Amino acid sequence: MEKTERKDLKKTLWVGLSCLIAFNIAILQALSILNPENPDESGVPYFFAVAAELFIIFVATNKKTQRQIFDVYCQPTAAKFFQWVCFLGLTQIIFSYNSTLIEMLLNFFHLSAQNQEESATGANETLSMFIYGSFLAPFGEEILFRGFLLQNFKRYGVRFAIIFSAILFGIYHGNIVQTPFAFILGLLLGYITVSYGLKYAIAVHIFNNMVLADFLDRFLQLFSENTATIISTIIMGSLALGGLYYLYRFWHTQRQKLF
């Protein structure tokens, strides 16, 4: 890597770090000003945080770059979108087993990550948290990680851009339960971005958060625990099997085009 490339990489990482710092400062400031009765259940502070994050990116990019962020490279078919949903189901299954394994290991040391898992998988309790979790978070995260970071990393190679942005996306989630899942999800969203366009990655991210996380959890609450487990296993298991099948097909037919 040449000196100029290293300088550009450092600049990109500093902008990304500045976004995360601004995000957290905005949350703290909003909490101190609004002083909500139940801070953990209010999504309003996160509205300001996403705005601060996007403002940093806006300042750090020129108009040409801002337009290019939303370039569309290919129009996906309905069948392709279904494949992506199957991949989401596969990542959810991986997340479930990973969470169980981590919990077993932590319990051995009299620790637990149960609260982290519940916060990552449960339905949002308030309208503001639903709006943030289902729409604003996917939009803001995709603009930062796939729209800004990945696009800047592409000058060092597509494979590097997808993997490194996915690693940063995993670290960003900040806990041992979500990080592996976020990394795998980041790989999928990175592939979608470079192959089809950022707006499709945003759509898939919204579908994951709103449908597979929030709506599905609310739907399962209508049933007894045993029945809900069976329904969840059938739905996610079917998607995961489809994900494995499409992953096998991709590995044998499409990987050379990307790598």
What is the meaning of each model-derived region?
Residues 1-82, 93, 196, 211-259:
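N-terminal, membrane-interfacial amphipathic/helix-forming hydrophobic leader that caps
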Residues 28, 32, 96-103, 146-147, ...:
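Short helix-terminus and kink motifs of transmembrane alpha helices
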